[in-house]
């Protein structure tokens, strides 16, 4: 009887180990070559320079933050933290090249690399070409639901 209980416990341990191993296989960590800059920016939406962030699709560029600047994009108007996205404006593939800045025109839904015209979606930072696996580097946004937006890493 004792051997049977030990055998069942052994089977359970093996089963749980396999489940953990298999579930861990799908986790992928994005490795950027871009060094991690210190980012801690506070944006006040009531400031006239931030007016574009009061509408969905509006954006604001912080030229002296990150490596190539930071683009803040208004995705939604739910008064929640996920309303905004903040992206590094240095291309994940050409960040160290002079041409590697991402640009976007007001109302444009894409960020375009200056080196090869490759495009990324402004909504989520993903590449529109599956050959490019790295998305644009995204920073954390905290929004108080009213006037204050904080961008950090």
What are these regions (language model features)?
Residues 17:
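Conserved binding/recognition cores within well-folded domains
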Residues 91, 112-113:
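Short cysteine-rich clusters marking metal-coordination/redox-active sites
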Residues 124-140:
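Low-complexity, intrinsically disordered Gly/Pro/Thr-rich segments
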Residues 108, 115, 123-129:
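Acidic, glycine-rich flexible loop segments
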Residues 26-106, 121, 137-153:
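N-terminal pre-ligand scaffold of iron-sulfur
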Residues 2-14:
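Bacterial N-terminal signal peptides that target proteins for export
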Residues 20-24:
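C-terminal motif of bacterial Sec signal peptides marking the signal peptidase cleavage site
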């Amino acid at each position: 009887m004792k051997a049977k209980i030990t055998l069942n416990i052994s089977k359970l341990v093996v089963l749980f180990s396999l489940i953990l191993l298999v579930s861990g296989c799908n986790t992928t960590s994005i490795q950027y070559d871009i060094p991690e800059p210190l980012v801690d920016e506070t944006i006040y939406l009531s400031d006239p320079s931030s007016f574009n962030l009061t509408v969905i699709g509006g954006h604001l560029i912080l030229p002296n933050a990150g490596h190539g600047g930071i683009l803040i994009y208004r995705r939604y108007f739910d008064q929640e933290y996920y309303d905004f996205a903040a992206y590094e404006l240095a291309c994940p593939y050409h960040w160290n090249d002079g041409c590697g800045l991402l640009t976007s025109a007001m109302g444009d839904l894409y960020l375009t690399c200056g080196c090869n015209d490759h495009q990324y979606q402004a909504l989520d930072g993903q590449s529109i070409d599956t050959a490019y696996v790295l998305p644009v580097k995204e920073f954390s946004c905290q929004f108080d639901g009213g006037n204050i937006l904080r961008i950090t890493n």
